[in-house]
Amino acid sequence: MSYAIFKHGGKQYKVVEGDIVLLDKMDKEPKALVELVEVLAVSKEGKLSFGKPFVNGAKIEAEVINEGRSKKVITFKKRRRKDSKTKRGFRRDFTRVRITKIVA
């Protein structure tokens, strides 16, 4: 089983061909092809190769499925005996992609 670890938007993801991953919003149309070139590590046929910081010649090809927004996350702070409270909500914009090919 071959897998790859790549970096996108300040986060690291471990993927296998066929995986569906939620990445930060990329402003791409559905069915568009995306190349992810910041590959940190690749495992092919039992051989693991690490990059310094990225693996030379390695890339991940993915297809955009759709875009969306996550469920709202509520942040609530209350200070006791102060009659002070803060409530904020946050929804992450994401792009859902399917990993089609790992090139090493």
From Swiss-Prot:
Sorted UniProt keywords: Ribonucleoprotein, Ribosomal protein, RNA-binding, rRNA-binding
SUPFAM superfamilies on file: L21p-like (SSF141091)
Entry similarity comment: Belongs to the bacterial ribosomal protein bL21 family.
PANTHER family named among the record's database cross-references: 50S RIBOSOMAL PROTEIN L21, LARGE RIBOSOMAL SUBUNIT PROTEIN BL21M
Subunit structure: Part of the 50S ribosomal subunit. Contacts protein L20.
Presence of the UniProt keyword Nucleus in the record: no
A biological process from GO: translation
GO function term, MF aspect, one: structural constituent of ribosome
Any GO CC annotation of this UniProt entry: cytoplasm
Domain of life: Bacteria
Taxonomic source organism: Helicobacter pylori (strain G27)
Protein name: Large ribosomal subunit protein bL21
Entry function: This protein binds to 23S rRNA in the presence of protein L20.
Entry coiled-coil feature ranges: none
HAMAP family, A to Z: Ribosomal_bL21
PROSITE patterns linked to this entry: RIBOSOMAL_L21 (PS01169)
